[in-house]
Amino acid sequence: MHNGFDALQLHANRLRGVTIPDLLAAELKRPEQYARQVGPLYFNFARQKYDCVALEALFALARNHNVAGAFQRMFCGEQVNVTEGRAVLHTALRGDLSGTSVAVAAYTAAAKVRERMYALIAGLDASEVTDIISVGIGGSDLGPRLVVDALRPISQGRFRVHFVSNVDGAAMRRTLDMLDPSRTAGILISKTFGTQETLLNGRILYDWLGGSERLYAVSANPERAAHAFDIVPTQVLPIWDWVGGRYSLWSAVGFPIALAIGSQRFEELLAGAAEFDAYALRVPLEENVAVLHGLTAVWNRNFLGCATYAVMAYDQRLALLPAYLQQLVMESLGKRVKCDGTPVDRDTVPVWWGGVGTDVQHSFFQALHQGTNIVPADFIGTIRNDDPYTENHFALNANLLAQIEVLANGQLSDDPHRVYPGGNPSTLILLDALTPQALGGLIAMYEHSVYVQSVIWGINAFDQFGVELGKHLAVQLLPALKGESVEVVDPVTRAVLVRLRG
């Protein structure tokens, strides 16, 4: 059998007419047997459309693809980013697990940079600065933005942090219009310091601040960062090429996080991720939540044929999580060739999307309940909420449970317009409370789930060449928009340029 895929297809065929209620009835201990607790995180896979026999075949697939060995290679600092010849050591930003010289050196370097970062924060604490503008895009923005928004209610930092990512000048103007330049500092975050959006927005911020005195930078090219904006080297924090942008919030890219929530809370975030790292590395495949989550995604994509995947955050503080995961998953797994350059032989990443409950129930849930597509989903909620509005929290979680149940079980009716077909599989994830530790562990779980999927599909989760061509073409077209004579080959682009130039 083809590395276990053929056996799994037989199981998918066997289960085609089986409903999720059928599975619950056949395996009476399923609600407990398909649940896992990892620190402050609870996972329940009981409403996924597989049984224990199919699940064992999924674990066999993981063994056939040596997922455990792949984890070891990544944590030890081997060059698992094969297309760029790089190690992948975001885990070393938050803990030292492998003990190899490469990983220890990475962990030590990251700790030293954090010390520098905290010293810069102490300097800002002693100043009159009240607001921070963080300029970055993609991995330099989505992770910090998510964490700052999620942990704002328990923040220990005294700074208000504002994020600007879009090259659209309206985004920067909206932020600047509400701030006082004399009480504002800026952080420019770019791995290469060649990102068009960050450079253009950075120039606006530089001019608005009246120079670089209160300007900071984070980059894997610190010399270019310092030179481009005349920033003193002591205000430039380094990152490394072994940290991908979408995995970088644990590094100095997290500077705005530490400013917003405080250094202690930032350390708790790292500790939560490190605890999950240790779990992912050491727990056997059959009990490992990251492995099970990744295998479930493969099952839904390749054997149930689901082309989209939804994330429902039933906590307003996690409203940005679907967008963050959209980048993490789709930029990592949106590949059509394997690591060796040959075409993949099955579908890879589905489209990830989602929203925040209960708002989503009044927008796209109609299509989930009565549309024609089966949409697997992760439902994420919190057990304890520290705000005083307890009735609201009860109502929120009642809706969370109700939607999961109806999407899976459906309901028959004599009126065809009122039939709920059900059949939508889901995973429930509950945080004991939305703490830095729990959020760090949750994000780390998704990182490792993505890696599991990449190993099964034989693709590189750590490059992103697909984003390059469009950026390159945009640079070529920019002079044409300004009226310069530029050869434009595409006839539609040529016609639209005439209209854009007026």
Swiss-Prot record:
InterPro entries: G6P_Isomerase, G6P_Isomerase_C, Phosphoglucose_isomerase_CS, SIS_dom_sf, SIS_PGI_1, SIS_PGI_2. Keywords: Cytoplasm, Gluconeogenesis, Glycolysis, Isomerase. This is Glucose-6-phosphate isomerase. It comes from Xylella fastidiosa (strain 9a5c). It catalyses: alpha-D-glucose 6-phosphate = beta-D-fructose 6-phosphate. GO terms for cellular component: cytosol. GO terms for molecular function: carbohydrate derivative binding; glucose-6-phosphate isomerase activity; monosaccharide binding. Belongs to the GPI family. NCBIfam families: PRK00179.1. Its EC number is 5.3.1.9. Pathway: Carbohydrate biosynthesis; gluconeogenesis; Carbohydrate degradation; glycolysis; D-glyceraldehyde 3-phosphate and glycerone phosphate from D-glucose: step 2/4. Transmembrane segments: none annotated. Catalyzes the reversible isomerization of glucose-6-phosphate to fructose-6-phosphate. PANTHER family: GLUCOSE-6-PHOSPHATE ISOMERASE (PTHR11469:SF1). The active site is at 331 (proton donor), 362, 471. The keyword Isomerase applies.
